[in-house]
């Protein structure tokens, strides 16, 4: 298996061992590269691609934590280790609510695990390292810029995501390492914000405190044993205090209900919504997957009601092969 593309973080923002009270090199050796192959008929093939690459973190013997979209519907996974070896992995599972994914290494890794810390204890302004596979030259010294709610266009909400600055250029699955050398989050996205008349980029990190409640189920069953949220199968964004549909999942509930790109979501069961987070939470409050979701929409000057028969998103995905 060929190595992942060669690149380096600019030297000015690479972490220096003398700046940290823990063994930086040891901590970064726990971060692995990840490369996955997705079948062409996968539900996420068009949106996320047939080949995906990023990072993962060794959190237990042979167990790698990553961001779930890298391994969703993966039929083949390769792990690139700090010593140059490449080991095949098995996608154990992906949790839709948190965004975490788990991979089991099918060969010996022989590197230390990164101890899990507390994301709740992490403070805005705290010095952190965003660790990428390949050591210091592919890792970034930064700080926590914010801890706040995040809503994603794919029907996803975190009550308190972590945002770091500057942004890591290969953020997916990176390890957010605290000032004490503990794992406090997993890299998910790069976002842009305007500040002092200029645009700057941040990383959005999934906080590690969301992992313990889901870890055992993911490891054993490939998904979490909880009531499944209703899924509408639409992509939406906020534009001037309005929730606007920007995409429809093929053959999903919204497509069956003939919701269209450009529709404005006015209300859920009569309750007005103006933010993504409020929209999703009102939908989820109406029951579990399969629940009928009453929406009020606005389209081309006309306001109308529609009922969407929600579904379980996982039923549209190729699941991990249990072993």
Say what each PLM segment does.
Residues 1-24, 111, 137, 179, ...:
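C-terminal cap/linker of serine protease catalytic domains
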Residues 8, 39-41, 53, 58-139, ...:
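Conserved active-site neighborhood of the chymotrypsin/trypsin-like protease fold
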Residues 8-12, 40, 167-170, 217-282, ...:
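PDZ/PDZ-like groove recognition
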Residues 25-47:
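A short, Trp-centered hydrophobic/proline-enriched beta-strand micro-motif
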Residues 32-34, 56, 62, 66, ...:
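Terminal peptide-recognition signature
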Residues 41-49, 92-99, 147-162, 194-196, ...:
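Gly/Ser-enriched beta-turn/beta-hairpin loop segments
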Residues 46, 74-76, 111, 131-143, ...:
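Active-site loop architecture of trypsin-fold serine endopeptidases
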Residues 50-55, 113-119, 161-179, 250-256:
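Gly/Ser-rich catalytic serine loop of serine hydrolases
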């Amino acid at each position: 298996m060929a190595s992942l593309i060669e690149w380096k973080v600019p030297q000015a923002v690479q972490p220096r061992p003398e700046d940290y009270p823990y063994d930086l090199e040891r901590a970064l050796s726990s971060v692995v590269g990840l490369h996955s192959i997705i079948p062409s008929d996968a539900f996420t093939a068009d949106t996320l691609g047939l080949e995906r690459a990023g990072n993962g973190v060794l959190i237990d013997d042979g167990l790698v934590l990553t961001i779930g979209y890298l391994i969703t519907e993966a039929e083949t996974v390769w792990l690139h280790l700090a010593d140059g070896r490449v080991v095949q992995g098995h996608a154990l599972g992906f949790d839709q609510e948190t965004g975490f994914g788990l991979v089991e290494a099918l060969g010996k890794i022989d590197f230390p695990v990164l101890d899990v810390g507390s994301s709740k204890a992490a403070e805005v302004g705290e010095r952190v390292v965003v660790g990428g596979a390949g050591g210091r030259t592919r890792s970034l010294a930064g700080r926590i810029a914010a801890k706040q709610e995040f809503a994603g266009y794919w029907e996803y909400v975190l009550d308190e995501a972590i945002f770091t600055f500057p942004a890591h250029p290969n953020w997916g699955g990176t390890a957010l390492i605290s000032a004490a050398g503990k794992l406090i989050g997993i890299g998910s996205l790069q976002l842009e914000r305007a500040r002092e008349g200029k645009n700057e980029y941040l990383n959005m990190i999934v906080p590690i405190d969301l992992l313990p409640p889901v870890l055992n189920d993911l490891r054993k069953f490939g998904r979490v044993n909880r009531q499944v949220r209703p899924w509408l199968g639409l992509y939406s964004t906020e534009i001037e205090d309005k929730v606007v549909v920007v995409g429809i999942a093929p053959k999903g509930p919204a497509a069956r209900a003939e919701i269209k790109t450009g529709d404005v979501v006015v209300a859920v069961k009569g309750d007005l919504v103006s933010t993504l987070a409020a929209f999703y939470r009102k939908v989820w409050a109406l029951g579990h997957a399969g629940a009928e979701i009453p929406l009020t929409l606005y389209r081309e000057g006309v306001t109308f009601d529609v009922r969407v028969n929600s579904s379980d998103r996982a039923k549209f995905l190729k699941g991990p092969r249990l072993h």
